[in-house]
Structure formats: C-alpha cells, structure tokens
Amino acid sequence: MPKDKWEQPIQPPPPLFLGEKERDLVKQVNDELIERVIGQQVLYYPISAEYTNYHPVYGEAINKNFLSPVRVYALIEWDGIETTTANYGLDKKYSMTVHFHKRRLTEDQDLYVREGDFVLYDDDYYEIVTLKEPREIFGQAGKSIEISAHCIKSRRGNFDAE
C-alpha cells in the first residue's frame, strides 16, 4: 500500500482542549459565580440511612430521620403555583427546581442528592421528588455538570426540622 494514502484511524483522537484542567477551570468559575455573584442558597436535609427504618420489601419508610442540614449554594428556578380543583376545594401546589453544581457537592461537600430529601428555601420546606442530570460538560459522556432537583412544597406537619 502506498505511503501517501490516508487510512481511517481505529479510534478518534483525544479532545484537544477539553481535558481535566479545562473541567477544573469550569468548576472553579462555576463555584465562584454561584457562590459569590448569584448567592442563592438552600439548606439541604439528607435522610439518615443508618437511623431510618426502611421496609424490607418496598424500601420505603414511614418515619424518616434526617442528618444535620448542610448549606448549599445553587441556582433556584421558581416553577410557580399550580391550582387544581378537587372534591374538597382548591389545592395549590408550589414547586421549584434546584440546580446543584454536581462536582461541588460530591467532591467538596461529600453530599449526594437523593429523592425524598428536603430543602429549606425562603422559610418553606420542599421535598425533592425527581432528579435529572441534564447537562454534560463539553458534551463529554459521563461528565455531567449539574443535578436538577424538582421540588414540591411540603405540607405543614409533613416535615419539621425543629
């Protein structure tokens, strides 16, 4: 085969400017932007897996025990109020989406967001009902940058941290 003929490489070349240093730079910029410029924060109440009595078959717990709250800087997206009519009158559901910086939580604060945990925002408690990881850094598979938690306001008496 002649030397001047092009051959298809077996693997694509590694990314030129998208390595570990660039991901660290993005983390540093996001940390500074979220904490020092935007400054929105929530108190995160993680469930204590050690002291909560889970059902052996269903994996659910009637009474949950929580660890001490952790202050977390995040981006808060207010979803608004949804009003529905039920048999007994109107029902209002307040919801918001909390966008957590994944590497800041897992690497620096050793915190893992889970469904069923609670957050305190603006003197109201919200329960995390769904989680998503919608964005990847530079489009690289397995390198998500954000955890989005959809939260619904908890009714009085359902959760009380005091």
Model-derived features with residue positions:
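Short beta-strand and beta-hairpin "edge-sheet" elements
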Residues: 74-78, 118-141
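N-terminal disorder-to-order initiation segments that are Gly/Lys/Arg-biased
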Residues: 1-93, 97, 101, 137, ...
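Eukaryotic intrinsically disordered and solvent-exposed regulatory patches
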Residues: 84, 113-115
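Mixed-charge, Lys/Arg-rich low-complexity intrinsically disordered regions
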Residues: 102-108
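Short, well-ordered loop/turn sites that connect or cap secondary structure elements
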Residues: 110-113, 120
